[in-house]
A protein has these predicted regions:
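Detector for the mature cores of small, proteolytically processed
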Residues: 2-88
Length: 88
């Protein structure tokens, strides 16, 4: 992904790479299918992961690719932000 960027990883493993501009809250909610929760990668402080806040409660499927990239368990669709694309 380089130093900056946005990647959306659907639960079915399809990758959608965006520009270096982070999505708006409304765009993020549409991409994750509900309320957005931001989690941080436990191993890389430059990575933020936007997920569905109710993903575990709703039983969303495990997202293997997002979990691998972020080194933490992720369910449902995920938006990965890095560098200048991070939310402040």
């Amino acid at each position: 992904m380089g130093n900056n960027g946005v990647i959306v990883i659907k639960e079915n493993q399809m990758l959608h790479v965006f520009t270096e501009t982070a999505p708006t809250l409304s765009e993020a909610q549409k991409l994750v299918g509900g309320l957005v929760e931001m989690v941080r990668s436990p191993t890389d402080p430059e990575i933020q992961i936007l997920v569905n806040e109710e993903g575990l409660l709703r039983g969303l499927p495990f997202n293997e690719e997002a979990s691998r990239l972020c080194d933490t368990g992720i369910v449902g669709d995920a938006i990965i932000l890095k560098g200048e694309a991070k939310w402040t």
